[in-house]
């Protein structure tokens, strides 16, 4: 639906699916990602909430847990809150220096790099 330009319909359908399948990780993650890929603060705020829920449902330090942490940081970055995004990454990195390893680690570090110039500018 999204590819066909029917994003609103896709959001509505996934919202319904999340209610019908509250324990289906694939459905929950797909909906959270759809919201995170949105274009406005309303979507990003909803995505932040969904990724927090996904984090709570996942095993600590699992790939899903790291993905949820990263996605929360992305949501904060999109919402114009680079300090909060950086804080999530730094706290996670303090406890788990490898940040999930591989691609996830690279994504975390790239997002942190993008947050830092905004922090310096915002503090001037």
PLM region descriptions:
Residues 21, 51, 55-59, 95-103:
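Alpha-helical junction/boundary sensor with strong preference for TPR arrays
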Residues 10, 44-47, 85:
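Single-residue signature of alpha-solenoid repeat helices
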Residues 30-34, 64, 71, 78, ...:
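"A position-specific structural signal for the A-helix of alpha-solenoid helical repeats
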Residues 15, 49-52, 90:
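Alpha-solenoid helical repeat scaffolds
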Residues 5, 39-42, 80:
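Residue-level detector of the short coil/turn that links helix A to helix B
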Residues 1, 35-38, 76:
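Residue at a conserved register position within TPR or TPR-like alpha-solenoid repeats
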